[in-house]
């Protein structure tokens, strides 16, 4: 979505993706796609040199917290190693503007919510730790060079547009899983943990629509002219996994069965954002602020694309 927004604003965009989890068909017309690993410094250098790149928006990295608990080495090699290669190559080719897709996972288990950017950084899984390491790296790179960066700490990205939606193989995100059950593509929704210290015993998360995340990246690119910064991106309201499932039942009018499972290691009980800093400094204002709106958009996409991107 960020790519489409940049193209609409008249920018030239090169998408660099290994396609390990991405989909070539999701790249909009007008953008060039280079299929390669970000750790391939030779290919990366050619792209930066040949395309006169002015800024990099880095969405790369593995993102499944539970998987990171089982495969920490894989996550650090890809998420941290990839960022090191990218930043070093950027500086070699005089590219000095960087927007980083970070995560609320850097906070771990917060003492209170909503979380501001000043909350302690105490990740509880290798995924969150990998994001925290890259943020620390950026502070050092920024202090020792003229690199300017913005780190955007996403809370739970969700929802879809008519053209773009979630299609992970395997799917691990709650809302797509719930909608797959509604479509009859899987028997039930696994509910990981029913004994958390929350009103209904389930994890609570702050959901933010993907189109609002995309707009934040555009604003972050503009912010780079003024300097570096770190911003939370969320709606400021938390919903439990049970509330998400019940909302999906109302929207889809389908039977959605739940199977309670043990807690997953590395899942904090509650993560809710304060995004006041992003609103004040970036001029960011989320447009899809209700859980119903987020799930309705995802439901439209999943019904129209029951096999995902194919």
What name fits each language-model region?
Residues 76, 124-132, 168-176, 206-207, ...:
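Short-chain dehydrogenase/reductase
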Residues 121, 157-160, 196-199:
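A short, flexible beta-alpha/helix-coil linker loop
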């Amino acid at each position: 979505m960020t790519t489409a927004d940049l193209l609409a604003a008249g920018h030239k965009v090169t998408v660099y993706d290994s396609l390990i989890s991405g989909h070539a068909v999701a790249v909009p017309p007008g953008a060039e796609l280079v299929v390669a690993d970000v750790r391939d410094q030779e290919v990366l250098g050619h792209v930066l040199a040949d395309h006169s790149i002015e800024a990099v928006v880095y969405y790369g990295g593995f993102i499944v917290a539970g998987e990171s608990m089982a495969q920490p080495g894989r996550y650090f090699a890809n998420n941290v190693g990839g960022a090191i290669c990218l930043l070093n190559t950027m500086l070699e080719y005089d590219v000095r503007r960087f927007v980083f897709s970070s995560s609320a996972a850097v906070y771990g288990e917060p003492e209170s919510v909503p979380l501001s950017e000043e909350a302690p950084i105490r990740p509880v899984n290798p995924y969150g730790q990998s994001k925290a390491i890259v943020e620390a790296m950026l502070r050092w790179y920024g202090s020792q060079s003229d690199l300017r960066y913005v780190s955007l700490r996403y809370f739970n990205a969700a929802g879809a547009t008519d053209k773009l939606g979630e299609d992970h193989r395997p799917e691990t995100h709650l809302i797509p899983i719930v909608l797959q059950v509604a479509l009859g593509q899987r028997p039930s929704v696994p509910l990981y943990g029913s004994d958390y210290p929350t009103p209904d015993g389930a994890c609570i998360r702050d959901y933010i629509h993907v189109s609002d995340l995309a707009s934040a990246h555009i604003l972050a690119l503009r912010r780079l002219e003024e300097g570096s910064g770190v911003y939370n991106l969320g709606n400021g309201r938390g919903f439990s996994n049970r509330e998400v499932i019940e909302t999906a039942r109302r929207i889809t009018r389908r039977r959605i069965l739940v199977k309670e499972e043990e807690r997953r290691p590395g899942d904090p009980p509650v993560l809710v954002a304060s995004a006041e800093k992003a609103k004040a400094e970036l001029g960011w204002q989320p447009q899809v602020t209700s859980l119903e709106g987020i799930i309705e958009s995802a439901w439209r996409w999943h019904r129209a694309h029951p096999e995902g991107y194919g």
